[in-house]
Amino acid sequence: MNFEELKKFYNGKRVLLTGHTGFKGSWLSKILIMCGAKLTGYALNPPTDTNIFDILGLETEMNSVTGDIRDLDHLKKVFDKVKPEYVIHMAAQPIVRDSYERPVYTYETNVMGTVNIMECVRLSNSVKSFLNVTTDKVYENKEQDKGYVETDFLDGYDPYSNSKSCSELVTHSYKKSFLADLPVSTARAGNVIGGGDFAKDRIIPDCVRAAVSGKPVIIRNPNSIRPFQHVLEPLFIYLDIVMRQAQDRERFEGYFNVGPDDSDCVNAKTLVESFKRAWGEGFDFNIHSDGGPHEAGFLKLNCDKLKKVYGWKPVLNVHDAIDLSVEWYKAWSKGEDMDAVTKKQILEYLNR
């Protein structure tokens, strides 16, 4: 990834990022700030008491707007005031298990939230490029051993996955109906890991909490295979898509899977064993299914389209991703300067 090219493109540009207070959103905000973008974020308050957004002090480095993506009137006012040139939509209710407990809220946020952002883009005279970030779970999951391709059927099972399938369809409809000349893409990313994720019911945060407390973590679905990748992998692709489709819409816009190579699609037990290796003393795990709601058992992405169109390939393998995650969390647990640690990891990633 050519960071100088990204900095040259984004420096001084008006960028609107929804979901900027979340795990991925905070990392992306940091990168855009390093690029010199005039960044506005639109999101609810951070989703957990301990969170990377506050740890990095991002609110002081950007125009951070507290708002609900379901509130169209407020979102319109932000668009009218900021006049964004580049829009990345990441705001979501992102947890599968929460979607079973709060299905209506999940659909309101993930479907109508997408309608609202697309409507603001439709009414805007300033937007030059738009990206909707969805998920690898948008596909009808057939528990197949081959990776899903972008033309496979969209039909997520649970309310979270299904709402993201709907978000894709909303984007496709707005593109065809209203935004034929505007560069519009969606990115369907795999499971991301990295420092700064403190969400519940996610495997690495659960491991960190267990390691810090000295208690073994419970692994619910040890054989579930996911396309795990470090958070920086998809984020730089998002920025590349937004930039390149603005420069050449016909060549670069589209719907793209973003995930690791097949060899890095590992099961939960392998991931936790790698975490144990990296963390060292004080961490252990037990395997015990809690009989929770349905989650996909086998999920891979075929990313050949992204590799062909963008010339992209993963930089990190899954064990590199674990090592970077553990490095970040251990630094945080020791009270180190996490802004400096985060910048260091970003720059080291770019130099690999």
Residue ranges of model-derived segments:
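C-terminal substrate-binding subdomain of Rossmann-fold SDR/epimerase-dehydratase oxidoreductases
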Residues: 34-37, 67, 211-352
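Residue-level recognition of oxygen-bearing side chains
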Residues: 15, 74, 105, 112, ...
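Glycine-rich phosphate-binding loop at the start of an alpha helix
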Residues: 93, 97-100, 204, 300, ...
